[in-house]
Structure formats: C-alpha cells, structure tokens
C-alpha cells in the first residue's frame, strides 16, 4: 500500500540525502522524486519486480535509464517495530541493492562489450523504484533527472500495454548493450559542452526572500 504523504515525506527526508551520497561516490547526481498515482500503481503491484528486472525496450532511453532500474522490495509493515525501524530497514535494502546493481552492471558490460566499445560508464542505477514511495530518478542536473523519470514513465506504459494483451518482453541483452554503448551516442556525449562551476551541486541560499539572496538565486539557476 502507498504510504501517507506525511510518511513519504518522513522517509524521503531521512533517506534521500543519504541515498544521494551513495549514488554519487563517482560523480555527483541530482534526484527527482515521482510518487504520482501511475508510478505507485506500478511499484506497488505484484508484477513490479518481475517487470522492472526485464528492463526497458525503447532504444532512445538506455543512456538515461540504463538497461534496468533498481527495484527495492520494501514493506514498512513487514518486520519493523516502528516506522523509524522500517526506514532503517529501507537503508539496508538500498545499500545491498546498490552494491549488487553495480556488480551486475559491471558483469553486463564485460559480458557484452565489443573491441570498439566505449569504456564502462558510471554503473549506479539512474532509476530507483521503492514500493510505497514511488520512483527516484538520477541525473547530472535537475532537468536531466526529470527527463530520466519521464523516460521510465514511458517504459511503464509500454509494460502495462504489453501485459494487457500478452507478456512483456524486453530487448535481448546484447542488442540493448549495443544501443547503450553505441559509438555514435558516445560521440554525442563527448561533444557536450563542459559542465559549469556549480554543476551537480545542491545550493541552499539563506534569506532569499528578497534583495541580494533572491537575486543570487536567479543568477545561479
């Protein structure tokens, strides 16, 4: 079941900064949280883990979403004596899940790489699915993480549509890899302009209701 808005807020306040640190050990990432009805219907469904493990099918999405998300099987009512304990349980599940995801992604790269393949990219998940909470998408900027979230929303709709008529099938692993690590895509990444000084940073400006603080916010956004 979906948590109340107050409970979701409590979880995210406690978990989100910690999780950002975990996924940002190689390069800092910025998160976008989505917990709308469609996302919650998916992550709370009995088929969510099976479908998410199969991966996405749209070639244009692989650079953002990777071949698959990290799905965390968390039930705050299952074992914990209190909600605070449930949040700590979630942290343990996330830490274990991230470690396994990174290992699996490295094996996927080694299994599928070709002599001309670009080097292994950042191997943490860019989409994290948590029952009761929704989706946390990651990117190098807020706008990129929002795009990642929208791409995975599209993937969910494809899965939902496929499951209504038959069974969802993702692209074969090698084909997915060849798209994700396509040399033309790598060339586009290499041609991107250099990141600005505060890229990937989260900035808090105190006293920004008016005057200098407000003007500073407009200048750095």
Give, region by region, the residue ranges found by the protein language model:
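Domain-length cofactor-binding catalytic modules of enzymes
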Residues: 1-199
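Conserved glycine-rich cofactor-binding loop
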Residues: 209-210
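N-terminal Rossmann-fold NAD(P) dinucleotide-binding loop
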Residues: 213-214
